[in-house]
């Protein structure tokens, strides 16, 4: 996604505090936060439905993409274009205004965090959730900084608030399914 929202940030802090109080160390607490606060509720349900619809689960030889959030969590790396929560006028930043590509502060943040993070991966499938994140990753790819990773552009944001999600998914599903099928998994 573009950035963690207020609710995700709040949930993450709560999970971190509980993890530490339960005796987990720093690394385990952070893993616990990531596992339990990534795409919760209907967003996770919608995401899994679309990923399974593209047969990602079959490509990964798992029963369902839902297991990426549980027993097969080691196959999944989640991140945001902007690593830290961003707010505009007291609300979650949606990525539309200002454009993160045209705003020098936001673009610098993306280059400092996301581009560096992407450089750690090679031949991985990157699934940008939503139009703005697709545009960001397309720009990073144009700049030659995507490191041979496969970009699954056209994937809609799984939020229930995205009323065009199903239509967008149907329009792009054959192209996305082909990319997944042709993807050479490099562990």
Predicted region positions:
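A polyanion-binding, active-site-adjacent surface
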Residues: 2-127, 132-140, 150-153, 160-164, ...
């Amino acid at each position: 996604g573009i950035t963690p929202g207020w609710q995700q940030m709040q949930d993450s802090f709560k999970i971190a505090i509980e993890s530490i109080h339960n005796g987990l160390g720093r690394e385990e607490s952070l893993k616990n936060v990531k596992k339990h606060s990534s795409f919760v509720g209907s967003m996770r349900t919608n995401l899994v439905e679309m990923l399974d619809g593209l047969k990602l689960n079959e490509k990964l030889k798992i029963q369902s993409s839902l297991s990426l959030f549980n027993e097969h969590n080691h196959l999944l790396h989640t991140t945001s274009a902007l690593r830290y929560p961003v707010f505009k006028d007291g609300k979650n930043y949606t990525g539309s205004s200002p454009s993160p590509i045209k705003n020098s502060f936001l673009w610098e943040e993306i280059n400092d965090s996301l581009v560096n993070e992407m450089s750690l991966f090679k031949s991985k499938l990157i699934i940008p959730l939503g139009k703005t994140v697709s545009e960001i990753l397309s720009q990073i790819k144009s700049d030659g900084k995507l490191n041979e990773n496969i970009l699954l552009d056209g994937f809609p944001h799984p939020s229930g608030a995205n009323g065009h999600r199903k239509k967008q998914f149907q329009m792009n599903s054959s192209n996305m399914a082909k990319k997944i099928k042709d993807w050479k998994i490099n562990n």
